[in-house]
Amino acid sequence: MDDLYLHFVQQLARYPFRKILLALSGGVDSQVLLALLARGRDEFGWDVTAVHVHHGLSPNADQWAQYCQRCCREVGMACQIEYVQLDVASGESIEKLAREARYRVLAPHVNAQTLLLLGQHADDQLETFLLALKRGSGPKGLAAMAAYAPFAEGHLLRPLLTVSRQHIEAYAKQHKLTWVIDESNADIRYERNFLRHQVTPVLTERWPSIRQAVQRSAELCAEQEALLQEFLAEALKKAITAEGGLSIAVLAEGSEGMRRQLIRAWFAHHRLPMPSRQHTERIWCEVALASEDANPKLKLNHIEVRRFQHCLYLVPPEKDLSGWRSALVPEQRLPLPQGLGHLQLTSKAGGNIKLPDDPSQLWVSFEPQGLEACPVGRVGSRKLKKLFQEYGVPSWRRRQTPILMYQNRVVCVADLFVDRDWSGQDCELVWFKSHDSVPK
């Protein structure tokens, strides 16, 4: 049993799985994995399948897909082709777009019993580490790629992560394997290719053990990051509100470094891209510490950081719904715009709304400007703007809260109050938020 195959088998023996899925690009690393997998399947009876992702970026993409299918047929392995389209005009790097698209189409193939195999090797790890270093990353970025990690409903494994490209190519030549060569790999305009051709050879010639050193550093960074996240998880429980906001008072208790890490953990909790160090400072200085009478907001990518009642909130940019209106037919669900869910006026004994004589005059709006109401239990009408403030509705939600109207009069504001003139027991207004089946 040769060294690489032994290493491969030992890697897989460490983890539980019932099925193996190989991400097959057709390059030398994935072709070596294919050969190792076929050998392991014959020896151990593994259930193995391959998936090739067709990015459509190269004029040779169709040929690569056919080549991967042919190679799999030769070893008796099923191979599925997944096609993706990349928005190359988005401004994002093609490398990032392609990587995200690959993971997106691979995910449905990975259930709880599946182990996804990826072909990244020690030279890829070195490049990833250097790219993170170039960006000024902390422990999370410098941890680079994990050898084993959760993915979709199962896990992924990079069994060649400690093996050099030179060793992989030597194995491929020794076993007379063939592979495709992506012509874009020679284009040093791409950062990773620049490192591969211009930087890594110099580093490895000067320090032959640098791959192993980088791998150790990456593992140490991953360990430090895991410990940090364990600590932050407890701190975040204290800082985060039931509505998902972040307490400014709790942030103020900690050091600058602690505050910065809590803000980043808050973003991670909401599954949003990490803010940079500069952005965390702006969140604190421009939003959290803004004057009491201000309504501060900071836009970061496709999200806004807002402040309300001594807490920070992450909200999507406000959409103008002032011109939207629609009739509301009792017992029928009304779809609301911008993913705000559905409304339904439901007959219910013991409800809180009196049904008007002519229900065809009922309609829904999001525009509170100029409207007044008197909630049940109060005396005298007030502007909706004032009522929103009294009910503690954040400014960004005030024009995203449905208002039920009858002709030109406010019947109720969803989830807040019913006007006293419309108090009754005929029906109730139910707001199904975010397309949930259960009203919130």
From Swiss-Prot:
Binding site for ATP: 25-30
GO cellular component assignments: cytoplasm
Pfam families tied to this protein: ATP_bind_3, TilS, TilS_C
Gene Ontology MF: a single term: ATP binding
Gene3D superfamilies recorded: 1.20.59.20, HUPs
GO biological process: tRNA modification
Subcellular location: Cytoplasm
The keyword Cytoplasm belongs to this UniProt entry's keyword annotation: yes
Catalytic activity: cytidine(34) in tRNA(Ile2) + L-lysine + ATP = lysidine(34) in tRNA(Ile2) + AMP + diphosphate + H(+)
EC number: 6.3.4.19
Keyword Ligase belongs to the record: yes
Sorted UniProt keywords: ATP-binding, Cytoplasm, Ligase, Nucleotide-binding, tRNA processing
EC primary class: ligase
Domain of life: Bacteria
Function: Ligates lysine onto the cytidine present at position 34 of the AUA codon-specific tRNA(Ile) that contains the anticodon CAU, in an ATP-dependent manner. Cytidine is converted to lysidine, thus changing the amino acid specificity of the tRNA from methionine to isoleucine.
Record remark on domains: The N-terminal region contains the highly conserved SGGXDS motif, predicted to be a P-loop motif involved in ATP binding.
Family to which the UniProt record says this protein belongs: Belongs to the tRNA(Ile)-lysidine synthase family.
Database matches in HAMAP family: tRNA_Ile_lys_synt (MF_01161)
The protein's name: tRNA(Ile)-lysidine synthase
Recorded name of the encoding gene: tilS
